[in-house]
Amino acid sequence: MKVTVCFGRTRVVVPCGDGRMKVFSLIQQAVTRYRKAVAKDPNYWIQVHRLEHGDGGILDLDDILCDVADDKDRLVAVFDEQDPHHGGDGTSASSTGTQSPEIFGSELGTNNVSAFRPYQTTSEIEVTPSVLRANMPLHVRRSSDPALTGLSTSVSDNNFSSEEPSRKNPTRWSTTAGFLKQNTTGSPKTCDRKKDENYRSLPRDPSSWSNQFQRDNARSSLSASHPMVDRWLEKQEQDEEGTEEDSSRVEPVGHADTGLENMPNFSLDDMVKLVQVPNDGGPLGIHVVPFSARGGRTLGLLVKRLEKGGKAEQENLFHENDCIVRINDGDLRNRRFEQAQHMFRQAMRARVIWFHVVPAANKEQYEQLSQREMNNYSPGRFSPDSHCVANRSVANNAPQALPRAPRLSQPPEQLDAHPRLPHSAHASTKPPTAPALAPPNVLSTSVGSVYNTKRVGKRLNIQLKKGTEGLGFSITSRDVTIGGSAPIYVKNILPRGAAIQDGRLKAGDRLIEVNGVDLAGKSQEEVVSLLRSTKMEGTVSLLVFRQEEAFHPREMNAEPSQMQSPKETKAEDEDIVLTPDGTREFLTFEVPLNDSGSAGLGVSVKGNRSKENHADLGIFVKSIINGGAASKDGRLRVNDQLIAVNGESLLGKANQEAMETLRRSMSTEGNKRGMIQLIVARRISRCNELRSPGSPAAPELPIETELDDRERRISHSLYSGIEGLDESPTRNAALSRIMGESGKCQLSPTVNMPHDDTVMIEDDRLPVLPPHLSDQSSSSSHDDVGFIMTEAGTWAKATISDSADCSLSPDVDPVLAFQREGFGRQSMSEKRTKQFSNASQLDFVKTRKSKSMDLGIADETKLNTVDDQRAGSPNRDVGPSLGLKKSSSLESLQTAVAEVTLNGNIPFHRPRPRIIRGRGCNESFRAAIDKSYDKPMVDDDDEGMETLEEDTEESSRSGRESVSTSSDQPSYSLERQMNGDPEKRDKAEKKKDKAGKDKKKDREKEKDKLKAKKGMLKGLGDMFRFGKHRKDDKMEKMGRIKIQDSFTSEEDRVRMKEEQERIQAKTREFRERQARERDYAEIQDFHRTFGCDDELLYGGMSSYDGCLALNARPQSPREGHLMDTLYAQVKKPRSSKPGDSNRSTPSNHDRIQRLRQEFQQAKQDEDVEDRRRTYSFEQSWSSSRPASQSGRHSVSVEVQVQRQRQEERESFQQAQRQYSSLPRQSRKNASSVSQDSWEQNYAPGEGFQSAKENPRYSSYQGSRNGYLGGHGFNARVMLETQELLRQEQRRKEQQLKKQPPADGVRGPFRQDVPPSPSQVARLNRLQTPEKGRPFYS
């Protein structure tokens, strides 16, 4: 393997073999290669303090490289080096006016040994309290550090100026001009050189403190004649030797610093200043906000703003961005903002207030210091006098009257190099800080630099047997690979599969090998393919690397004064700021945004409304998105109410306005600050909830370690979903980012489960399967996670008992709220497979995914509570009856639910186009006039013949009437369309009767099933209906059937069924009678028209023997006898059957039908009597559908004959005179050739030719095609019909005279109606002189 070590902008690739070398050996090789890269000789001085991983972890010097780094990883060196422009310590050619200490004079003059070596014991100095009391400010710094160019760093004796160094009076010791040193002259050239140097150092950390006074090139020359030099160096070397013995490490090249864990414990007092404020009862004039570390811990109160003219500004007590960490005896660290405010108010009652303040300049170092502490506290070392002089003698001189207080025991990032002197306690606003190295080489400012991503762990061999449910885990890798490859980690343990059954594999394990195949350099796709290649029932061998996640409890505070009794603990717990109803508490969070900002805050929110008056109740957290800032922060919870965002209150605003405020604040203010401040209201947990170590339930813990259980989980618990499982506060932050976790350690439920305590889920969910076993990363792309519950029978008998609980108000118990990812939810696959003990009792309908914005603005509510489902009314119907659409807002949902509540059991349906007519009474009358029964049955899925007692929502949703399947208008034209010929109709009736019986049986079964399903649980799929309804979806259709309440007993249904069958039988009999009358009327019309010569007056046409040829249906003997009887009644002989029935001419009939339709359209405004009079001239010619009804079956034949005779006698003569002059114009169509031949053979008469030229009929010239021709339309129809009949009469007379009837006379033809080519051909073949002259029209 090989790694890349970055020295500033220079990167060095170091080959490491198999990686079994130690880190300090890597440092040696990297330094050697770096010297070659920058073209320096081996004597060029370089000091490497530490190596940091690219992900932010710090590598220990004695770690094995392969355990803490991967192949092609990038490491960052934090180092110091010799000035690249000049090498020397005051004796080089570039240095003028300076000299090295005398002790090195002989060495430098005799050989080339580097001057950058530790001082000898004879050249040490010791700073004693007596020297310090003599007001000689001794400030030691490294000459190569430019951080204190403007700070006070001077070495002087009593003869030098005693002015206190400050930012206004910067002084430097070493070779700078302006430094008043005896017997030396300053060099401006050296001062300018120091300012223009190109430094290559990085910000320093606490590990460099012990070497800050060592002899190397980072320190300028001291005068050897100074009396304190020898004693100082001797003391410094003793401290270094003790540190090396404790660490037991071999120092790398450049005498690098030792590990942080073995450094002496330093206090916070060197960066904290004490501010004494006499309390005169007035306000201080400061505005404070919570100051939180990036890891989420509260570090104190931040002075955000000073009031103009206030006490703090006038007396120069505070500055902006100062951090108050302690007030009198109260430590403000790790306190919630409400508790800190309470402590502040308590302190304001004292006469004198002591503020422990971290100046704004030290705030960053203080924040880094807080991150490096591992939850360890040390008592009683906040004040300087409580610390041993052997550790830091420079910190021992401070006012003894200062109050004692506990302090942190971890090493700071930057410590002051001088004590706070009594006379300068208020002279300077902040003490001079320790030197800080130049920042240009800062390559990694990762938040998680305190956490070592490459901690030493253990390797495990795990064998998993692949079953039908797979291996049962998912893997992930880095989003951005380093060097082309990335490690593979186990992301989730699925709720089914081999992994959860085995129980050894955990989320976060790194895969090293799969079946002996090394995964180094392999991509995630290759690893997936390798895992999937395992055969069914085969065994896969996994070699995983698991980092040790030991829980580090807080140390107990040993001071009795800091111990707290149970009564005090209770009192402290009562100080929590609660809402007026006492059910919730206020919490303040500073949530840092992600570097990428891809998911934003990463929460989905919802707006709730009151069920009584529909008032807005506020904005609540609906869900927390994995990978977002809130998820990584780990403090925000589902169902938290957002009170304020970035100081802007959301209270009192409408939901929509609050949503807009939330969006705006997150997008603008959050991006500017890099973090979002949230004030939330959270429901107080129950007393039986498990508490983490250090929670208020543990009275033996001190107040400093006492934390609310939520706050404990916020900062320490790595899996906030299940309390009581392996809490690991040192959870790898970088690994969590890779895993997409929200600070949660997802564990297998078979490993490390508590034995004595009941596992409680957050938000008090039911203790069944832990939710982390589901694939949380894909919760937005899957349906609801299913579960198995032991009390399935209880669920099957329950529905929503009170729809008022459907609204989740702030004071509603979240355990009663519908949880989308919670218990009681099933995925679609589980609903289909019915994973319950008794599947017949359950009928779950489909649900759909709820989509939420990443920013999380979604007006949604949570329904279907657990308690409601367990104790519900079986008669409730809150399913599809609400009539909501997919885009239903919260308001429409609440309104619909409220209406259902007010109306009791009245079922709601989607809006219907009209009121559905029932058929519960007077069925005999309806059968006589209603034609809706006449429609033949279609396929079984259609709603054709609905039974009387059922009415489905399907028909109403599609806009149809559910009972009547056709229009209730029994018109002749509609009847012709709906009813086919009698034979087909009889067959359809038989099929319909049979299908109706089968369908009624099916409905009986469905009703029996629905009786058991009246009290069924209706999920969100019933409340919301998404998409179109599919008719073939039997489950949805059966689930939506609503039973009418018209018939309440079985006797009524049986009686109604019999009545229905009787009505249908009468309907069939009535239809057959109509068909017989219709057949008689048509035949009578034909024979009356084509009868003997004495019938011409009322028939309009001669007898036509071939009329029966147009009837497509042969007559039975019974029908023939009936025809004879009818002919006898009208005293007309019945003609014999024609010899040829194939000579049908449908052209005349079609023309008559078209004229009839035109007449009906134009005659709509006339009365019925006029219409009947006009119809008397029409003849019922046969059509291609001879079985169609004529519509005159209720009129007696004799009455028709008498009326027709009388009307024709009155109008025939007048009509004949008018029609003789009516113009005719032949049409040209596709058969123009045949038409021309027709006109040549039959020349028109003289009267007709003259009539064509008559301008009186010009308005009719263009109306031959059936369109309205003008004002004479009705007369034209009547005259044309009469002319047609007259011509047919004449033609029949000629035929009867010239040929016997047995020859089969052809049907009438008209010239103005072009015949088909087949007709023209037949006419040409049959054209003989015996047939007589043709008729013209």
From Swiss-Prot:
Q: Quick one: a GO cellular component term?
A: apical plasma membrane
Outcome of mutating residue 504 to A, per the record?
Answer: Slightly reduced binding to membranes containing phosphoinositol lipids
Q: Which family does it belong to?
A: Belongs to the PAR3 family.
Please give the name of this protein. Answer: Partitioning defective 3 homolog
Gene name, per UniProt, is Pard3
Q: Which PANTHER family does UniProt cross-reference here?
A: PARTITIONING DEFECTIVE 3 HOMOLOG, PARTITIONING DEFECTIVE 3 RELATED
Task: List where Polar residues composition bias occurs.
Answer: 150-163, 171-188, 207-224, 1138-1147, 1219-1240, 1318-1327
Q: Which residues carry this modification: Phosphothreonine?
A: 91
Instruction: Please tell me the species this chain comes from.
Output: Rattus norvegicus (Rat)
**Which keywords fit this entry according to its UniProt record?**
Acetylation, Cell cycle, Cell division, Cell junction, Cell membrane, Coiled coil, Cytoplasm, Cytoskeleton, Differentiation, Lipid-binding, Membrane, Phosphoprotein, Repeat, Tight junction
- Tagged with keyword Cell cycle: yes
Phenotypic consequence of residue 491 to A: Slightly reduced binding to membranes containing phosphoinositol lipids
Compositionally biased spans, kind Basic and acidic residues: 190-203, 981-1009, 1030-1043, 1148-1175, 1284-1296, 1328-1337
* Free-text description of this protein's post-translational modifications in UniProt: Acetylated. Deacetylated by SIRT2, thereby inhibiting Schwann cell peripheral myelination.
